[in-house]
Swiss-Prot record:
The gene is cysC. Catalyzes the synthesis of activated sulfate. The lineage of its organism: Bacteria, Thermotogati, Deinococcota, Deinococci, Deinococcales. It is an enzyme of class 2 (transferase). HAMAP family: Adenylyl_sulf_kinase (MF_00065). It comes from Deinococcus radiodurans (strain ATCC 13939 / DSM 20539 / JCM 16871 / CCUG 27074 / LMG 4051 / NBRC 15346 / NCIMB 9279 / VKM B-1422 / R1). The active site is at residue 105. This is Adenylyl-sulfate kinase.
């Protein structure tokens, strides 16, 4: 039995007058497993928390373990998982929270659907070539998928439909985490 993925400590609710961000927003990180979605989202979470923003991180692995347990990896199950994440993100954003979603969310039409339903949503494409994510994969899942041992593996035996027009495109094989966070902060301040 595997341990449940850990969640970062929550920034407690701030009284309405003390909130830095009055309107909530959703930053949706999408990309292949190992591209750096969770790494960037966690680093941004820490920075926004330090600035006093009400912020939450919804990590795809943690959501799958806690909210979407029992779902498989069919197209329908993946879409259901993405819609559940979007529902929770929307509830939080409605109450002035900046929500960082880190989820593969492989299908473009489902991403468009959920992003259109969310307030102040930004789509961030976290991009790294298959060779790079395979090298980063400490569990060896990509090698197993490439050998045919893992069916329905996004980017290998199941499609990943890259965003055509993301709000921000971060190529993590070319930039540092710090550079990525600075680009994200710049984009977030542009949208305020």
């Amino acid at each position: 039995m595997s341990a449940s993925p850990s969640l970062p400590a929550s920034q407690g609710p701030l009284p309405q007058g003390e909130r830095v961000n009055k309107a909530g927003r959703v930053v949706w990180f999408t990309g292949l497993s190992g591209a750096g979605k969770s790494t960037l989202a966690t680093a941004l979470f820490e920075e926004l928390s330090a600035r006093g923003e009400a912020v939450e991180l919804l990590d795809g692995d943690a959501v799958r373990e806690n909210l979407s347990k029992g779902l498989g990896f069919s197209r329908e199950d993946r879409d259901t998982n993405v819609r559940r994440i979007a529902f929770v993100a929307g509830l939080l954003a409605k109450h002035g929270v900046t929500v960082l979603v880190s989820a593969i969310s492989p299908y473009a039409d489902t991403r468009r659907e959920v992003l259109a339903s969310l307030p102040n949503a930004l789509e961030v494409f976290v991009d790294a070539p298959l060779e790079v994510v395979t090298e980063r994969d400490v569990k060896g899942l990509y090698l197993k998928a490439l050998a045919g041992e893992i069916p329905h593996f996004t980017g290998v035996s199941d499609p990943y439909e890259a965003p055509e027009n993301p709000d921000l495109h971060l190529r993590t094989d070319r930039i540092s985490v710090e550079d990525g966070v600075q680009q994200l902060l710049g984009r977030l301040s542009d949208d305020r």
